[in-house]
Amino acid sequence: MLLPLYHAWACLCFCAALVLGGYVLVMMYGSVGTVRRRRDYEEFEVDVPPGSLGLPVIGETLQFMAAIKSGRGFYDFVESRRLRCGRCFKTNIFGETHVFVSTATSAKMILNNDSGKFTKRYIRSIAQLVGNQSLLCASHQQHRHVRGHLNNFFSTCSLSAFIQQFDVLIVKSLDDWEHRGTVVVLDEALKITFKIMCRMLLSLESGRQLEMLQEDVSIVCKAMLAFPLRLPRTRFQRGIEARERIMSALETLITQRRLARTSHEDCLNYLLSNDDETECKKDPKLTTGEIKDNILTMIIAGHDTTASAITWMVKFLGENETVLDKLRAEQVCFAKKMSGRPFLKLEDIGEMSYASKVVKESLRMASVVPWFPRLVLQDCDIEGYKIKRGWNVNVNAKSVHFDPAVHDNPFEFNPSRFDDESKLPYSFLGFGAGGRTCLGMNMAKAMMLVFLHRLVTTYKWRVLDPDSTLEKWALFSRLKNGCPVLVTRLAEETTDALAD
Ligand code: HEM
């Protein structure tokens, strides 16, 4: 998840390296002919994955940057090499060897990590922003400890308490869409998911405190894509300052909660309530530092991803009338069934069979987190090739999602492909897999389902701009145009007809 960020700031280094690159190239190899011989030699190595390491120093960084700049995203870069070299290939980006794998079997081996040969990449500048006790940066031991506590909170029973709150918030947010006519879905979804995350984590719903937090989180997110230069007014330094403000606001909130001993229905309350329990040597409570770093991590990891996923889902549905009709029929029937009961419950979500497949199919097609980077800790074999310690291996989720050998007609938006429960394991990687599977997976699915239910039973919409260009240098796969749609309220006769 962090590799794209690393590449973002590394691109600045790269520009400087470009100037030096030509010089170094000539100095190191003397002539272009020598460079060619080196590349030819690499291609004939038998036991390492195929693929070119490109030019000395700069590798294939130029091509990588061009793919990202094109707006089609990094997938183009990976896909052209996959077609040429096969499902396991190597390249060199920003001076490091990267191996890309795109089979469900390799995904299983790397993400499950039973051999302990892989670890999530640690990037110092990211750790400075989210905190080194964050799940994204913690050591193996600390990760297990923090994850254990958070897993308990994210269990189904906590989710059940939040469904109604999601629903109230979504109904309120969707209420004024019809008066606006044109709505940019991504902008609206970002507001909704930020509020939901802050409600669920800290019981913050509105007011100046929420606005300030949103501003600061956005500064931290932008800093993740910046060159990590700690000079006054640099983007990175502004991110560090925003982090400090967030930490201090969380510190105040935690102190107030401890002093007042008031109870709230939120994640912070859950983590602090462990304060009262007898100290357990095996699994001690989370420290204030761990709590603060991970609240920030969850806001960052949860709101942008879910908002992007919602946006793609609205686009795919808007462009696939048959699927939308089938979904609307399911949801309108459902709405009639629960008439008299104003808000949704966890059990309702469990009954939304087709809608759940729509969510899954949207995540497959969108591949919001397109690849998962890991660092190789020991030499190993993948797909019959030798992989060296210190290399990066990337599980290329998007290629698995679009592999015709795994998913029939992969470019068709067809939720019914998930009717068959016995699908190849690890063929759907929308939330990752193994010990690093998305912590908020169930929560994200629930948010998407509640949103979907309210949207399709209240509105019809038309996608105004079908452009699928990706936002450049965004944290996740986000639509550049944000998906503008024209919204109109559904006529009552339509919903009545569908329910009959
Ligand atoms: C549709 C929305 C979401 C998508 C597509 C998504 C996707 C992912 C993926 C693919 C990973 C694994 C990355 C890897 O293995 O390298 C991940 C990790 C993570 N996600 Fe999500 N996520 C979503 C929503 C959320 C939400 C709502 C939260 C809120 C808690 C969240 C918190 C996290 C955290 C903390 C991690 C790191 C887990 C760890 O390393 O142990 N995500 N997410």
Please report, for each region that a protein language model flagged, where it lies by residue.
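Conserved cytochrome P450 catalytic core segment spanning the I/J/K helices
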Residues: 155-157, 179, 241-310, 340-348, ...
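Hydrophobic mid-domain F-helix/FG-region of cytochrome P450s
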Residues: 15-26, 95-108, 132, 149, ...
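Conserved cytochrome P450 K-helix/beta-meander segment immediately N-terminal to the heme-binding cysteine loop
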Residues: 395-421
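Conserved cytochrome P450 K-helix E-x-x-R motif and the immediately C-terminal K′/meander segment
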Residues: 62-86, 241-248, 252, 341-383, ...
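Cytochrome P450 catalytic-core helices
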Residues: 305-323, 328-330, 442-457
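Cytochrome P450
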Residues: 2-23, 92-99, 157-168, 177-199, ...
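Cytochrome P450 proximal C-terminal region
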Residues: 1-24, 49, 82, 170, ...
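N-terminal membrane-proximal hinge/A-helix region immediately C-terminal to the signal-anchor transmembrane segment
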Residues: 2-145, 160, 164-172, 378
